[in-house]
Amino acid sequence: MKVSNFSSLRELTIAALVISSVTACGGSGSSNTTPEASVTPPTPPVSETPSEPDWQAGVYEPESNFINQCESPRSGIDPFSGNSYPDEAGTAMDEKLWMRSWTNDTYLWYDEVDDNDPANFSIAAYFDQLKTTELTPSGTPKDNFHFSRATEEYNTLTQTGVSSGYGVEWEFVSLTAPRELIVQYTEPNSPAETAGIPRGASLKTIDGVDFVNANTQAEVDVINAGLFPSESGNTTNLTFELVDGSELSVSVTSADIEVSPVQNVTVLETSAGKMGYFQFNTFIRTAQGSLINAFDQFVNDNVTELVIDLRYNGGGLLALASQLSYMVAGPNQTDGAIFETLQFNDKYPTRNPVTGSTISPTPFYSTEIDYNAGLLTNTLLPSLSLTTVYVITTGSTCSASEAVINSLRGVDVEVVQIGTPTCGKPYGFYPTDNCGTTYFTIQFQGVNNKGFGDFADGFIPSSTPNFEFELPGCDVQDDFTKPLGDASEGMLSAAIQYAESGACPVSTASSTSASLISGTQPNTPSDSQASEQANASESLIAIKPPHTQRDELILHNKINEPILRGDN
C-alpha cells in the first residue's frame, strides 16, 4: 500500500447576517418629519459545525489530524485517569479516518488492508474490515484477533477485575439446536458457586424455556436475556443435567463478579516429587498478588514439579507473563536473557510506533510491578528455578499464555504440553482509546530469546515432536467429569503420569499434528464461528453470547503496556 500525504481542506461556513435599518414615516404630508433611529439587532453567536473531511484512496494524513475528533464527544472527568476527556466535536468521518491512518501506520500487515471508502460503512463496521484477509498455512484467517470495546467497560474489567453476570464460565459446544452449553468453572463467591452449580453441568432449561431445542425467536430472546444479563439484579431460573445424570434446578441473581485469575492452588504428592498445581485464567493486573502467594507456597513446600493449568487462559498483560516465566525458571536461567522481543511492521525496524521509544527486548521481570504507575519495584519475586514445567492447554490457551510457553523454551526450560493445540497468537497490540471506544489491532509479533515466534497455528502436543511448534507431551481432551485441580481429572492426571513415567496415558498417546493440517482447534466459539453457526441453516436460530467477544477482546489478548524501572 503506497503512502503519501495530502491536505484535507476543512471549512466552517458562517452565514452572513444582513442588518436592515427600518425607517417609519409619520404625520400626513408634514415636511418636518424626523426619521426614527435605526435598530440593529444583536449578532447571534456563530455555531461552528464541523464539516466532513475528505477521503482519497491511497492517501493518508497523519492520525494526529483526526484523533479525539468525535461524533459524540465525552465531557467531564475520566474516573479511571482523573483527567478531563480529550474529546472535541467532530464527525463520524473524523473517527473513521483516524482509525484508517492509525491502521496504516501501526498495523502489522498494513499493506494487506483494502483501502475502502469509509463513507460506505458505519464507524464499527469500518474498523471491522481494517484487517488482512490472508490465511495461515493451515487455511485459517491470519488475523482472528481484531476487536473493539467501549473504553469504560474495558477499563472496568482490566483495572478492577469486575464484570456483571452469574460467575459461570461456559463451554459453548453448540449455539444452535440441539444446543449444548457446559459449565467450565464458576468464580469463587459468585451467585453460581453459591447456588452449587458444578463443573460439567449441562444447561437444559432457562426460565422455563427448553434451552436445547427451542427455536422460535421469542424463546431465543428469553434464553439470551436470562443467560447474559446486561445488569446486576436480574433473577433467572436454570435447570442442569449433572455428570451423574441427576438434575439440578437453581435460581440465580446476576451481580458484579470479581474475576479470580488464580484458583485451586494445591500441592500434590507424586512419585516424581511434590507437584505444585494452579489454575490460571487470565493475565490481568489483579493476578500479580495471587501468583506471588501461590509461588510462595510452592517454595515453602519444596515443590520440584509444577503444572500450570492454562486451558482457559486467553492471555492479557505481557509484563505479567514475563513475571510468571521468571517465577518458573528463576534467576540463573533468565539473567540477561530475553523474555520477548517485539517486531513491528517494516516502517518501524528500530522504533516502537506507539511509544516512540527505541525497540528493546523485554527481559524476564524479576520484581513486583506497580501496575498503576507502570513501574518496577525492588521487591524480588519468588521463584522455583525449574528446568521442566507442565502446561495444560486447549484452543482457548492464547497469546500471553503462549508467550510464557515460548519464552521458557527460549531459555531451554522443557515445556511439556498436556491437552490440545493452543490458539496460535504470537501477536499483540496496544489498546488505544478514541472517542470512548478502545481499539485492538495487531501491531507486533513476539519472538523469544532464540528468535522464534512462528506459531500462528498454535503449539501442538506430540509424542514425537519434529517441528518448533510441536512440544513433547500428550493429546488429552478436557475432562468435565471431575473438578479442576482434582488429581483424577483427565488432563492433570496425564501430567502426573508423564512426570512419573515420561509417557502419556495409553489412550492419549497419539500425535495431534493432524490438527495443523485440518486447521481444527477445540475452542470456545468466536464471534465469527457463532455467526457461521447462526447462518448454517435458516431454520435454526443461534443464541448470541456477548461475553465470548469480551473474553477474546480483553482476556484473550497479548497486551503490551510500558513498564519502567522505578526510582524506589
Question: Which residues does each predicted region cover?
Answer:
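Bacterial N-terminal signal peptides that target proteins for export
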Residues: 2-13
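A general structural signal for short secondary-structure junctions and capping/turn motifs
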Residues: 4, 157-160, 228-230, 268-269, ...
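Hydrophobic helical h-region of N-terminal Sec-dependent signal peptides
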Residues: 13-19
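Alpha-helical structural motif
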Residues: 14, 95, 487-491
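Secretory-pathway extracellular proteins and peptide precursors enriched for disulfide-bonded cysteines
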Residues: 17, 57-64, 459-466
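C-terminal motif of bacterial Sec signal peptides marking the signal peptidase cleavage site
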Residues: 20-24
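Flexible, low-complexity junctional segments that flank or bridge functional domains
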Residues: 29, 33-36, 41-306, 312-314, ...
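C-terminal "post-core" interaction segments
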Residues: 275, 282-305, 314-568
